[in-house]
Amino acid sequence: MGDTQQPTVLDRFAPHALDTSEAERLSREYHKNGPYNHVVIRPLINDTLLRNVRKELMENIHFTEKVTDIYRVWQTGDLANLDGLDKKEQNMLKYLRQVRDALYSEEFRSHVQKITGCGPLSASKKDLSVNVYSKGCHLMNHDDVIGTRCISYILYLVEPDEGWKPEYGGALRLFPTLQPSFPAADFCHSIPPQWNQLSFFRVKPGHSFHDVEEVYVDKPRMAISGWFHYPQPGEPGYDANYCDNTVSTLQSLTMKQMDLELPRFSYYPVVKPEPLSKQDTDILSNYINPLYLTPDGIEKLSKRFFQDSVIVLVEFLNQEFANTLLKRIIDAERQPTPMHSSEVSFPWKTAIPPHKHRYLYLDHEEFGPDIILPMDLQRLPAFQRWIQLVSGLPLRSFHQVGRRFRPGSDFTLATTNDTALLEATLCLSPGTGIANTDNGAYDIYMIGDEDPDVDAAVYRGDQQDDSILLSLPAAWNVFSLVYRDEGVLQFVKYVSRQAESSRWDIYSQWNPVAE
């Protein structure tokens, strides 16, 4: 009986995938591609093996939906520790383990090194997971710079026979930078998913910005994603100073980007707190529901705010003024929505950089009969006296910005504050469908997590999270006033393309007088 040849690591790859000539060809592509070096390999894995992996995952893996400020996705845990599973569990994921070991094999790491010129890669640090993007899932702009990451990769396991069309969404989108650490508003290169396709790029501080386009169809965009790391302690090529150097580089780059950030907030003085005069009430009644202007009404609001640190006022604007605004906003919604920053025209501007926020905005100076949103209201001395009466806080300065969050595009990522603030939002989003939180567009306040290894803005995961302080869906004619303590996270969740309209609002921050 003849000897049976044992399969090798190379047998787990597609024919000729690791040939020297292929590495040379891919290296030329990698170094030519922009906006930063990247390359696509297809096919990479033995087709039968990868089909078995997909079948294993569909049948044996539990996916948990996780929602944060930056993403919505179905995830597995870290798959590096497959070796630690019991024998039954290992057997249920034996093909996945074969692919994991193939990706981190000496043969493939050497192939990646030849393509990228990145130098040695860690054999011991396996860092990967399986993600499924269902309809509505997305990942916002970021650069992947964490720890010792060197190469970021994604291996697609979308349906192998039907194919994945670009109009399904889910593309990996790459962003150029206006300067290091400052990505442009718009992506310049898009890589749609394909079966058995590996896309990878070098993780470079200040440059490797990318996102994942929302998935628009009821088809699972399944992928194995992960990173190759620089050598770890004890491995050839280990550099003990790498992480410190990366942090230093990032801090230096971040300090240089502030001048480009938009909008730029200018704070304006606030009048001294005083009771409302009849003239004040007459002025405000042109805008605000009279129920919120009576002495008794103001006293009730003030008591509620003192107790809860938040009030939410429905039908805030009077009916006549609200109807006028509604017509303006619906007329604007019926016009083609400018999606690329080059299509945005005065008086609107695009908020950047997109790894912090993206939306259209009107700044403090933009007001008048041709401006859709009532930017003049909070500038009125009468309104400033009213908000101080309601909040019970003497205020010294404020800024405001009118915003439009477009479906399929806009969001703010979680920010924290160094001092306590008073925040007011007048939400003017038309239609009842915009209030469906499955489509995002809600404003959220959360307790920040002090553990740097925890994703602070996770608010939907394995268990019901009690870190949410306040969640406000987009709505029509609703005014919210929030006392935001130091360290509280706040963001507006990405607006899905499924939303029936934009989120429109006027957001303002008010600085209390120091005690």
Swiss-Prot record:
<dbReference type="GO" id="GO:0031418">
    <property type="term" value="F:L-ascorbic acid binding"/>
</dbReference>
<dbReference type="InterPro" id="IPR043044">
    <property type="entry name" value="TPA1/Ofd1_C"/>
</dbReference>
<dbReference type="GO" id="GO:0140311">
    <property type="term" value="F:protein sequestering activity"/>
</dbReference>
<dbReference type="GO" id="GO:0005634">
    <property type="term" value="C:nucleus"/>
</dbReference>
<dbReference type="GO" id="GO:0031543">
    <property type="term" value="F:peptidyl-proline dioxygenase activity"/>
</dbReference>
<dbReference type="GO" id="GO:0005506">
    <property type="term" value="F:iron ion binding"/>
</dbReference>
<comment type="function">
    <text>Prolyl 3,4-dihydroxylase that catalyzes 3,4-dihydroxylation of 'Pro-62' of small ribosomal subunit uS12 (rps23 and rps2302), thereby regulating protein translation termination efficiency. Negative regulator of the stability of the N-terminal transcription factor domain (Sre1N) of sre1 which is released from the membrane and enters the nucleus to activate hypoxic gene expression.</text>
</comment>
<feature type="binding site">
    <location>
        <position position="144"/>
    </location>
    <ligand>
        <name>Fe cation</name>
    </ligand>
</feature>
<dbReference type="GO" id="GO:0005829">
    <property type="term" value="C:cytosol"/>
</dbReference>
<dbReference type="Pfam" id="PF10637">
    <property type="entry name" value="Ofd1_CTDD"/>
</dbReference>
<comment type="similarity">
    <text>Belongs to the TPA1 family.</text>
</comment>
<dbReference type="GO" id="GO:0006449">
    <property type="term" value="P:regulation of translational termination"/>
</dbReference>
<keyword id="KW-0805">Transcription regulation</keyword>
<dbReference type="InterPro" id="IPR006620">
    <property type="entry name" value="Pro_4_hyd_alph"/>
</dbReference>
<keyword id="KW-0223">Dioxygenase</keyword>
<dbReference type="InterPro" id="IPR039558">
    <property type="entry name" value="TPA1/OFD1_N"/>
</dbReference>
<protein>
    <recommendedName>
        <fullName>Prolyl 3,4-dihydroxylase ofd1</fullName>
        <ecNumber>1.14.11.-</ecNumber>
    </recommendedName>
</protein>
<keyword id="KW-0804">Transcription</keyword>
<keyword id="KW-0560">Oxidoreductase</keyword>
<dbReference type="InterPro" id="IPR019601">
    <property type="entry name" value="Oxoglutarate/Fe-dep_Oase_C"/>
</dbReference>
<dbReference type="GO" id="GO:2000639">
    <property type="term" value="P:negative regulation of SREBP signaling pathway"/>
</dbReference>
<feature type="binding site">
    <location>
        <position position="210"/>
    </location>
    <ligand>
        <name>Fe cation</name>
    </ligand>
</feature>
<dbReference type="Pfam" id="PF13661">
    <property type="entry name" value="2OG-FeII_Oxy_4"/>
</dbReference>
<feature type="binding site">
    <location>
        <position position="156"/>
    </location>
    <ligand>
        <name>2-oxoglutarate</name>
    </ligand>
</feature>
<dbReference type="GO" id="GO:0019826">
    <property type="term" value="F:oxygen sensor activity"/>
</dbReference>
<feature type="domain" description="Fe2OG dioxygenase">
    <location>
        <begin position="119"/>
        <end position="230"/>
    </location>
</feature>
<dbReference type="GO" id="GO:0071456">
    <property type="term" value="P:cellular response to hypoxia"/>
</dbReference>
<feature type="binding site">
    <location>
        <position position="221"/>
    </location>
    <ligand>
        <name>2-oxoglutarate</name>
    </ligand>
</feature>
<dbReference type="GO" id="GO:0018188">
    <property type="term" value="P:peptidyl-proline di-hydroxylation"/>
</dbReference>
<keyword id="KW-0479">Metal-binding</keyword>
<feature type="binding site">
    <location>
        <position position="142"/>
    </location>
    <ligand>
        <name>Fe cation</name>
    </ligand>
</feature>
<dbReference type="InterPro" id="IPR005123">
    <property type="entry name" value="Oxoglu/Fe-dep_dioxygenase_dom"/>
</dbReference>
<keyword id="KW-0539">Nucleus</keyword>
<keyword id="KW-0847">Vitamin C</keyword>
<dbReference type="GO" id="GO:0005737">
    <property type="term" value="C:cytoplasm"/>
</dbReference>
<keyword id="KW-0963">Cytoplasm</keyword>
<dbReference type="InterPro" id="IPR051842">
    <property type="entry name" value="uS12_prolyl_hydroxylase"/>
</dbReference>
<dbReference type="GO" id="GO:0032436">
    <property type="term" value="P:positive regulation of proteasomal ubiquitin-dependent protein catabolic process"/>
</dbReference>
<keyword id="KW-0408">Iron</keyword>
<comment type="subunit">
    <text>Monomer and homodimer. Interacts with nro1.</text>
</comment>
